[in-house]
Amino acid sequence: HIAIGNGTASRETEQMTVELIRRLGGNLRYMIVNEAGASVYSASKLAAEEFPQFDVNLRSAVSIARRLQDPLAELVKIDPKAIGVGQYQHDMPQARLGEALDGVVEDCVNAVGVDVNTASPSLLRRVSGLNAATAKNLVLYREEHGAFTARKQILNVPKLGPKAFEQCAGFLRVPESPAVLDHTGVHPESYAAAQKLLEACGCTLEDVSAGKIGGLKEKAETLGLEALAETCGVGVPTLTDIIKELLKPGRDPRDELPPPILRTDVMELKDLKPGMELQGTVRNVIDFGAFVDIGVHQDGLVHISRLPRRVKHPSEVLSVGDIITVWVVDVDEKRGRIGLTMQDPNSK
C-alpha cells in the first residue's frame, strides 16, 4: 500500500500514484493519510535519534507511512496538541488542555494494550504506571537480556518497582510467554480468579491456548455471574472483562473496527452528484456537524441536522476516524463545498 500525506502537493501526488497503479496493476492501493504533526515529529530530538541519517523531509515521509501501518504507535511520538484536536483548542488554558489530551492518549494505549517485546519507549511511556525513564529502562533491559518470556520478569527492570508493576502489568502483553494469561489483559492479581472461573466452567488454560472455550460466556451465565464472581473473589465487571480476555487471548480491539478505505482511482469534485452513496472517514467533529473525507481532497460537511438521529452534539454519534456511509446532498464547485447526509434519501 502507498500512504500519501494530505498536505502540500497531495493532489498531484495522488494523480501520479493513480497513474502508477494503472500501469503496474496488481493489488496496489493507496490512502490519503492525515499528516498533522508529521513536521513537528521530523524536527524533534526523537526523530533525530531514530533516523540520524535522514533529513527532515524523509523523516516526515516515514512518519506518514507508519501512520498507515500502526497509527497509535506513531502518533504517541508527538504532542497531541500538534494534531489539531478541536475547534477552540488554543482558547483553552494550555496546561489543562495538555493534561486532558495526555489522559486520552494514555486511555487509548491502555485500551489496546502493548506488546512488551516490540513497543518503543514512546509507546511504553504512555502506559499507566510507566514514565519516560522506566520505559527507556524497560527497552534497555530487553536489548540486554532478550525478549521477555513472562510478565513477572518486568519486575527485574531497574527502577520499576512493585507499585509501578501493579499499575502497568495488565496493559503489557507478553506473547512469547508459555503462560497464556500473560498474552491477555488479565492482571496478574486476577490470575487465580481466572483459573477458578475456568474450573467452574469445566475448562482449562490449555483450552484457552487452543481456542476451545467458545461457550465460556454461556456457561458462566448459566451458573450465574454474581454467584460466580463471588466464588472467584472479584466483582461482576472484572469477571466479565476476564471472560472477554479469555475468549480472545492477545486480541487487538482495533481488529473489530472497519478497515481503512484504500483507493485505486482518483475522484474529482465534478464527479460528485446529489444522491451518490459514498464511504468516508470522519476527520473532525465540531459543534455544528462533522467533516468527512470522501476521497476528493475537500472534506464534506455532515450538518448536525443530517445526522442519523437527533443529538445535542455530533460527538454523541461520531468520533474522529469513524468510517461511515454518507450521501451527497449538494456540491458547490466554485467555493469547494460539499454537503453530505447520513440519512439515506432512499428510505422513507
Model features per residue range: what roles?
Residues 1, 73-74, 336:
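Flexible helix-coil linker/hinge segments at domain or subdomain boundaries
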Residues 1-53, 61:
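Duplex nucleic acid-engaging cores and interfaces of nucleic-acid transaction enzymes
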Residues 7-9, 32-40, 81-94, 156-162, ...:
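A glycine-rich phosphate-binding loop feature that marks nucleotide/adenosyl-phosphate handling sites
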Residues 10, 147, 333-335:
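A cross-taxa feature marking solvent-exposed loop/turn segments within ectodomains of secreted
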Residues 33-34, 117, 293:
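Non-cysteine beta-strand/loop elements that form the S-adenosyl-L-methionine
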Residues 49-147, 153, 162-198, 236-264, ...:
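Long, highly charged, low-complexity intrinsically disordered interaction regions
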Residues 172-348:
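Single-stranded RNA-binding regions, centering on S1/OB-family and related RNA-binding modules
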